[in-house]
Amino acid sequence: MSSKTASTNSIAQARRTVQQLRLEASIERIKVSKASADLMSYCEEHARSDPLLMGIPTSENPFKDKKTCIIL
């Protein structure tokens, strides 16, 4: 590979890197303490509708067997 091609590839790679860094720098950031407080608040507000915390009523559970086994 010639040095001209290598330098062209290097410049293209550097431009992609700069573009990616500019994109990342423009992202709005919040402090971890605020993000965790918001997450805790969201979890507490939606806890009643969370089936993993409250469970699924047996009448609404589509995976529960409708009838028992005759052998048992």
Curated annotation (Swiss-Prot):
Can you give the propeptide residue ranges? Answer: 70-72
**PTM sites of type Phosphoserine:** 10, 26, 49
Which residues, renumbered to this chain, carry the PTM N-acetylserine? 2
Q: Which residues carry this modification: Phosphotyrosine?
A: 42
Q: Where in the cell is it found?
A: Cell membrane
User: Which key words are in the record?
Assistant: Acetylation, Cell membrane, Lipoprotein, Membrane, Methylation, Phosphoprotein, Prenylation, Transducer
Q: How does it sit in the membrane?
A: Lipid-anchor
Quote one Gene Ontology molecular function term: PDZ domain binding
Lipid attachment points (S-geranylgeranyl cysteine): 69
InterPro entries, from UniProt? G-protein_gamma-like_dom, GGL_sf, Gprotein-gamma
Under the heading Pfam families, the entry gives: G-gamma
Q: What is its main location?
A: membrane
Similarity field: Belongs to the G protein gamma family.
How does it associate, per the subunit comment? G proteins are composed of 3 units, alpha, beta and gamma.
What does this gene product do? Guanine nucleotide-binding proteins (G proteins) are involved as a modulator or transducer in various transmembrane signaling systems. The beta and gamma chains are required for the GTPase activity, for replacement of GDP by GTP, and for G protein-effector interaction.
Descriptive protein name: Guanine nucleotide-binding protein G(I)/G(S)/G(O) subunit gamma-12
In its UniProt entry, the species of origin is given as: Mus musculus
Taxonomic classification, please? Eukaryota, Metazoa, Chordata, Craniata, Vertebrata
